[in-house]
Amino acid sequence: MSDQSFLDWPFFNREHRELATRLDQWAGDHLSALTANEHDDLDGTCKTIVKALGGAGFTAYAVPASAGGHHAKLDVRSLCLIRETLARHNALSDFAFAMQGLGSGPISLFGSEAQQADYLNAVAMGDKIAAFALSEPDAGSDVAGMTCRARRDGDDWVL
């Protein structure tokens, strides 16, 4: 276990300290085995990590309580502790967790009730991997420069 004296800072409460300790222990016990093949099967390893994080209850921090999360609203301190702890143990694990929040955030904030019901609980459980579009040719990571658009065609969407 690393030095966790920072958890004594006044903006962390008992729940944050318990979360950091529990995740650090879990990561030490599980991540080496989960990520042993990450260079051979990157996609498969990410799926395995997300499923395991979900099974341990950690991806539920990426969605609100209404979708199976731990808090009524997302708790940024918990999210930061999770990301820092995962990154210290394995960078790919941090990336896989971060995508759960980045992809589900827009659905939490702007998704229809049907979209929220379909995706967010599955994200909380680690059963679905959230994603979002950030890049395309000639736009790089400039979201405003993207030219891809979606238009409704009957019951479908066409990109």
Short names for language-model regions:
Residues S2-D3, L42, A139-D142:
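Short loop/turn motifs at secondary-structure junctions and domain boundaries
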Residues W26-A33, P106, A130:
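Short alpha-helical functional segments enriched in proximate histidine and acidic residues
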Residues M1-D3, G28-S32, F58-A65:
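Short acidic (Asp/Glu) and glycine-rich catalytic loops that position anionic groups and cofactors
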Residues H70-A72, A114-L159:
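Glycine-rich, Trp-frequent "lid" loop and neighboring beta-strands that shape
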Residues G28-A56, G69-H71:
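Short secondary-structure junction/hinge motifs that connect adjacent elements
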Residues G55-D127:
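Internal helix-loop-helix
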Residues M1-E18:
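Intrinsic disorder at enzyme termini
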